[in-house]
Amino acid sequence: MSNISTDLQDVEKIIVLDYGSQYNQLISRRIREIGVFSELKSHKISAAEVREVNPVGIILSGGPNSVYEDGSFDIDPEIFELGIPILGICYGMQLLTHKLGGKVVPAGDAGNREYGQSTLTHTPSALFESTPDEQTVLMSHGDAVTEIPADFVRTGTSADCLYAAIENPDKHIYGIQFHPEVRHSVYGNDILRNFALNICKAKGDWSMDNFIDMQIKKIRETVGDKRVLLGLSGGVDSSVVGVLLQKAIGDQLICIFVDHGLLRKGEADQVMDMLGGKFGLNIVKADAAKRFLDKLAGVSDPEQKRKIIGNEFVYVFDDEASKLKDVKFLAQGTLYTDVIESGTDTAQTIKSHHNVGGLPEDMQFELIEPLNTLYKDEVRALGTELGMPDHIVWRQPFPGPGLAIRVMGEITEEKLETVRESDAILREEIAKAGLDRDIWQYFTVNTGVRSVGVMGDGRTYDYTIAIRAITSIDGMTADFAKIPWEVLQKISVRIVNEVDHVNRIVYDITSKPPATVEWE
C-alpha cells in the first residue's frame, strides 16, 4: 500500500526542530494560530535539507538534554549560516549558545535553576515589541547560560537567570530561556507573533480556506479520473475527509460505512441522511449488526471483544471493497499527530503511525491522507469551513469498538439498548445545560452490575448505569468534570424513568491516571 501525502512544499512555513520537549506540538500549533504554517522536523536535519524545505524561520525547541553531555541532541552548525531567522527556546537557546562559542553550565552550579513562573525584565528588541518591559513567563531549566557568544547582546533577565533572552539582530538569531508557547507565559503568543511576522517577515496568510483550495487542486492532480475508496465511520475525521474529497472529485469517491450495530442512538441514520443526503456522498452501507453480535456472543474479555470487532471490520470492509471496480486509491483520516514520528525521532514525540481501521496492508491501493498535516482543532475548523454542521464537527470522540467497550462483560441487545438510550439522554441534557463544549468527553456505561430497587409498588433488580465525564487538554491526563448537581439529578431522573432495565445511576469521579477514560 503506497502513500500519497499532502504536499505543502510551496507553503510559507516555519519549521520547529525537535529536541524532545513535551511542548513541541504546542509550538507548532501556536505558530499556525498566528497564520503561518509550521511543522516539526528532526534535529538531525542538515543545512542542505533545510534549504530544500525553504522555511522563512526556524525554531529550536526545548528538551531534556544538557548540551555539555555526551550524546546530547545536536545541530548542523551550517544552519546558523543560512541567513534564516532562528529562535532558540530553553534547550534551543543553550544549544545555539554552546555551538556559537558561549558557555552553558548546570544551573545549580550557577545558583540559578528555575522551574515555574518568573518575572522577565527585557530591553528593547524586535522580539519583545509591544509587550511590557516586565512580564510573567514560564521557566523550566536545570542548566543556564553564563557567557554569551561574540556579537550577541543580552535582552532579558529574571531574578534567577542572568541571560533570560539573548540575540544577534544582525544575523537574526534569538534565544529565550523561557517557554513562550505555554499559557503561563502571559505574552508568549505576542513574542511568537513578533518572531513569525516581524522578524521572519511571514505574511500570516495560512488559513483553512487556503488549505481547502490547495488540497482540492492536489487531490484532483493526484487522482485524475480514478476512483477513491473511503472507510466512513461517522466520526469527525473520516466525515471531514469525505466532504473534502466529494468537493474535489464528486462521484469518483465511494464511501463504505460499516454499521456494526454498536453505534450510538441514531448515528447510522445521521451518517446516511447528513453525509449521504445533504453533502451527496456516495455511500455503500454494510448492515452487519447481526454478523458482529453473533461473533461477540458469550465473549466477556475486553481485549477479545476488541480483537473480534477489529478483525470482523476488516472482513466486512474487504467484502464490500471487492465488489467495486477500478478503485485505485484508499483515503484515510490520518492526522498530523499520528505521523509526527516520520519527521522527528526523539523518544518524547514518537507516536506509532496507525493504519486507521486496521485495514490489511496487502490491499492494492495507493493511500491518500488529506488531513495528515492538520491537528484535531484544525480538522474541526476545516469542517466548519466546508459548511458541515456543529453536531458533526464537534462530535464526541468515539472508540472504534463502539458501545461494545461501554458494556461490561458479555454483550446483549438489552445491555446495548440501555447504553444507547442513556447516552442519548446524557448528551441531550449536557447540551441543554450549555456544557457540551466545556467537557472533553462524556458517555454512559452499563456496569454489568445489577442492584435491588423499588419502582412504584414493586421490587426491581436491574442494571446500574455509570456516567463518565472528563475535562482534559490533550487526553493524556484528565479530571472528572464538575457537572452541577442539578444537571446530574435531571440526567439521573430521566434515565431511570425512560430507560428500561435500569434502576440506579452512579457518577465516576476518578481522574486519569489512575483510571483510563474508557472503562474497557
Curated annotation (Swiss-Prot):
What positions does the domain GMPS ATP-PPase occupy? 206-395
Report keywords, A-Z: ATP-binding, Glutamine amidotransferase, GMP biosynthesis, Ligase, Nucleotide-binding, Purine biosynthesis
Q: Identify which top EC class this enzyme belongs to.
A: ligase
Q: What EC number(s) has UniProt assigned to this enzyme?
A: 6.3.5.2
Q: Which NCBIfam families match?
A: guaA_Cterm, guaA_Nterm, PRK00074.1
Q: What does this protein do?
A: Catalyzes the synthesis of GMP from XMP.
Q: What is this protein's record name?
A: GMP synthase [glutamine-hydrolyzing]
Q: Where does this protein come from, organism-wise? A: Streptococcus pneumoniae (strain ATCC 700669 / Spain 23F-1)
Corresponding gene?
A: guaA
